[in-house]
Amino acid sequence: MRVSRLMLVTLRDVPADAEIASQQLLIRGGFIRRVGSGIYAYLPLMWRVLQRVMRIVREEMNQIGALETLLPQLQPAELWEKSGRWQGYTAGEGIMFHLEDRQERSLGLGPTHEEVITELASDLLRSYRQLPVTLYQIQSKFRDEIRPRFGLMRGREFIMKDAYSFHGDEGDLARMYEEMEKAYTRVFQRCGLTAVGVDADSGAIGGAASQEFMVTADAGEDLILISPDGDYAANQEKAVSIAPPALPLPSGESRVISTPGQVTIDELCSAQSLHPSQVVKVLLLLAKLESGDEQPVLVCLRGDQELNEVKLVNALTQQLDSPVLDLSPINADQVKTQGLQPLPLGSIGPDLSDHSLAGARSWKERFYKLADTTAAELERFVCGANTSNEHRWGASWSDLGTIPAMDLRNAKAGDHCVHRPEQSLEERRGIEVGHIFQLGRKYSLSMGAQITTKEGKQEHLWMGCYGIGISRLAQAAVEQHHDDAGIIWPLSIAPFQVIVVVANVQDEVQMALGEEIYNELLASGIDVLLDDRGERAGVKFKDADLIGIPWRVVVGRAAAEGNVELVKRSERDANVLSRAEAISSLLEAIPTELRIQL
C-alpha cells in the first residue's frame, strides 16, 4: 500500500474533545473520526488494526472448538420480557436503544445476546448428545451511554466478540470457563497487551461467577485491587479485604451530646476529637424496584468506610426478590414530596423509627435496614440521636437493636488481604477488555431451554457467556503503547509492519531504491507501507512516528551508496545498513506466522 492512496489525514493539534492520550492519538493519526456523541467511523488504518485483532480472536475461539455465527442486532422485546430483563434495560439502567416498528411491536438494538442465543438453544438443542457446544460472533453492539467518553472506550456503538456455551452439567460449564480463561489470556498476550484477570461483579448479565480482564493503564476507568503475591485481584466493585481495626472509644457512660453544625463525619470528628472509625454513619437511600415498589433503605457504615453500591444493589435484589432499577440518596425535598415530617438528616441513628415513614405517598412505610460488618463489629461508638444537632456517645447495638450485617464497604488500597492478612492490597487502574461469566441456569430456567439427559429426564441447560471488546481492546493497546511522538503498535496488530519512507521522491535514486525495498518486502509476505508523498521529509517522519508502524526504513541521501536507515519505532535509534542487511533484519524480526500468506 502507498501512502498517496491511503486517504491518510493526520492532525498536528490535539482535538479539544479528546480526553485521554489514546483517543487523541487515534484521531490525530487518522485512525478514527467522530460522527456523533459516542459514535466513531473506523478509517482504513483502524480497520486494518481491528481486522488483525479479530483474526487473533477467531483463531483462539476456533482453537477451543467454538463455532462462529451471526445473530440479529434487532431483538424482539418479548424475548427480553421472557428473561425478565426488558424493564431493567429500557426503563432501569436505560442502556438499550429500543424502538417500535410499523406494527407497534417493540424491538431492542442488542447490547448483548443472551436472550436470542438461549431461544435458539431451546429450539435447536434437544439431547445431551449435542453438548457441549459453544457459539460466538463478532459484530457491532449498542449501548445508550449516559455520558459517552474516551473515544472507543465508552461509545454508543462498538465492536464486540461474544460467545455462549451450553452444557449438560455444572462441571462441564466450569471446564469451558477455564478453557475460555486460558484462551483470553492468549488473545491478550498475542495482541501485545499486559492484562490481568480479576474477580468481578456479574452485573445485569448475572450468574454465579465472573472474571474481568483488565489492561493496566493510568487512564483506566476501573479501580482494581491486587495482592503483592499476585494470588488475588479484583475489581473494587467485587473486592473483599480486612479493614484496619477501629480505634476504641474512650470509656464513659452512654450519653447524648450536642453537635450543632456537625453534619458530616469530618465535621463531627474534628469538633469532638474522634477518629472516623469510632463513628457509625447512617445513609438513607431509596431503592426503586422492577416490581414498582419504592423501598427506603437505611445503611450503617463505620465512619472511615465508603459504601459499595454494587454490593448493596446485589444484596437488595436478592433479599427483596426484585431487581433494583435505581438507587439514590434520600433528600429533604423527597421527604417533603412524600408528605412526611422533615428527617434529622446529618443526625440520623441506626434505630430511626419506621414511624417517620407513616403516611408516605408512594414509599414503603418501613425501612429496610442493613449494616456493614465493620460497623456491626463495633462494641461502643458514636452515632446520630435522631434529633437535629444531637449524637449519641457510647452507643451499642444491644441498646439500638441488631441489624443484619454483611460486606457492604469498598475495599481499598492498604487494607489487609483476606487470603494472607500480612499482605496489603495495592491499587491500579484498569481498562476492561474482556469479561467471562458462569451464568448457570439463569436464562435457561426463565426461557425454558431444556435437553433430554442420558437418563431420559428433562433438565435445564447450564450456560456460560464470554465477551471481548474488540474496538476497546485496540484503543487500550494505544493507551499502553505510546510515547510523546505517537502510537507504538505491537507488531501483531499494527496496521502495517514496515513503512518505507522516501525522503525525496524527486530524487530518482532514492525513489528507485525505495520501490525495490517495498517490492522485495511485499514478495516476502511483509505488510509494508510506502510513503511516496511529495511532502517534506520532516513531515513524513512525524507522521510515521504518529501512526506507530513498528519498523521504518528511511531511504535518503545514503541511497547513492545503496544504504538506508532502519529504525524500530519502540527504540527510535537509527542503524545505517545496506539494502540487503535491512531486508534481512526485517525478515528476522517479523515472524513467519505474522506475514501475509502468499
Curated annotation (Swiss-Prot):
It comes from the Bacteria. Its main location: cytoplasm. Its EC number is 6.1.1.15. InterPro entries: aa-tRNA-synt_IIb, aa-tRNA-synth_II, aa-tRNA-synth_II/BPL/LPL, Anticodon-bd, Anticodon-bd_dom_sf, Pro-tRNA-ligase_IIa, Pro-tRNA-synth_IIa_bac-type, Pro-tRNA-Synthase_IIa_type1. Keywords: Aminoacyl-tRNA synthetase, ATP-binding, Cytoplasm, Ligase, Nucleotide-binding, Protein biosynthesis. GO terms for biological process: prolyl-tRNA aminoacylation. GO terms for cellular component: cytosol. Pfam families: HGTP_anticodon, tRNA-synt_2b, tRNA_edit. Transmembrane segments: none annotated. It is found in: Cytoplasm. It catalyses: tRNA(Pro) + L-proline + ATP = L-prolyl-tRNA(Pro) + AMP + diphosphate. GO terms for molecular function: aminoacyl-tRNA deacylase activity; ATP binding; proline-tRNA ligase activity. Catalyzes the attachment of proline to tRNA(Pro) in a two-step reaction: proline is first activated by ATP to form Pro-AMP and then transferred to the acceptor end of tRNA(Pro). As ProRS can inadvertently accommodate and process non-cognate amino acids such as alanine and cysteine, to avoid such errors it has two additional distinct editing activities against alanine. One activity is designated as 'pretransfer' editing and involves the tRNA(Pro)-independent hydrolysis of activated Ala-AMP. Homodimer. Belongs to the class-II aminoacyl-tRNA synthetase family. ProS type 1 subfamily. NCBIfam families: PRK09194.1, proS_fam_II. Consists of three domains: the N-terminal catalytic domain, the editing domain and the C-terminal anticodon-binding domain. This is Proline--tRNA ligase. The lineage of its organism: Bacteria, Bacillati, Cyanobacteriota, Cyanophyceae, Synechococcales. The gene is proS.
